[in-house]
Structure formats: structure tokens, C-alpha cells
Regions:
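Glycine-rich, acidic/polar active-site loops that bind/position phosphate-bearing ligands
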Residues: 1-156
């Protein structure tokens, strides 16, 4: 039986911007299914998920993938956060999403991701004039062509 490093990963309770947290459990391998990964506890008072006098929270594995850094049989384990009584923690927004997806499983989900970023040339965004601002975005929003879009060679 091999030993597997399972990196349990969860979202903390900080607001307005939550952070990722993780800790490693050594489990007997190989891990063949989600049920091979046990629930695990953590101190929620250190992650803004519980008060200091009642700080127990639980990590419930919901998905795992091979660990690209440690390799071999080691894993990254995505977890939901539960209260000590196994109810859904208020910071666990995934649980509500799963409930909605289950309730509306007969409908097709559509979503889009728009990755926004800005390249800089010195103190100005790439392609901006040295003084002031460019013309209104109409010409270059979702634009095509070297006269409208800058930095394409980096993006591609």
C-alpha cells in the first residue's frame, strides 16, 4: 500500500475577497474514488469561518485531480466547508450552486468568461498615447487589426 499526499484545498471566510487555504493529509493509496478521501477538520477561527470558542469546521472532499507538482499518485483535493454538525457553512457557496444545478438539471446552463487584463508600456497602457487617453473604446472593444489591438503577439 502506497502513501499519498492529498492536498485539501478550500475557500476561507475572508470578505470581501476570500482566499484559498490548504493542508496536506497522508492517506493510504491508491485513491480510486472520492470515498477514499476522508472528511477532515480545521480551525475555522484562523480562517474567518468560526469564533475562537467554537472553532471546529470540516472539509468535505468533492473533487480531486492529480497533483501536477508532486506528481506520482499525489492529489489536489477540492473541498467544501461544513460546520462541526455537518451542515453547510455560510462561506460554502458551492453547495448552493450544486442545489440550483440539481433543481434545474433539465435546463442547459450557459455562461461566459471574460478575462480582462492590461499590458503596460512604462506608465501607460500599451497603445495609449504618451499624453492623455485614446479615443472612446468603440473602435477597439473586441476589435480586430493592428490599428485597434496591441500586444496580440503576447496573447497568442
Amino acid at each position: 500500500m502506497s502513501k499519498v499526499k492529498a492536498e485539501y484545498i478550500w475557500i476561507d471566510g475572508y470578505s470581501p475577497t476570500a482566499n484559498l487555504r490548504s493542508k496536506t493529509m497522508i492517506v493510504d493509496g491508491p485513491v480510486n474514488e472520492l470515498n477514499d478521501l476522508p472528511e477532515w477538520g480545521f480551525d475555522g477561527s484562523s480562517t474567518e469561518q468560526a469564533a475562537g470558542d467554537n472553532s471546529d469546521c470540516a472539509l468535505k472532499p468533492v473533487y480531486y485531480v492529480p497533483d501536477p507538482i508532486r506528481r506520482k499518485d499525489h492529489l489536489l483535493v477540492m473541498c467544501e466547508v461544513l460546520n462541526a454538525d455537518n451542515t453547510v457553512h455560510k462561506s460554502n457557496t458551492r453547495a448552493a450552486c450544486v442545489d440550483l444545478a440539481t433543481k434545474h438539471k433539465d435546463h442547459e446552463s450557459w455562461f461566459g468568461i471574460e478575462q480582462e487584463y492590461t499590458f503596460y508600456n512604462g506608465e501607460n497602457p500599451l497603445g495609449f498615447p504618451d499624453e492623455g487617453y485614446p479615443a472612446p473604446q468603440g473602435e477597439y472593444y473586441c476589435g480586430v487589426g493592428a490599428n485597434n489591438i496591441y500586444g496580440r503577439e503576447i496573447v497568442e
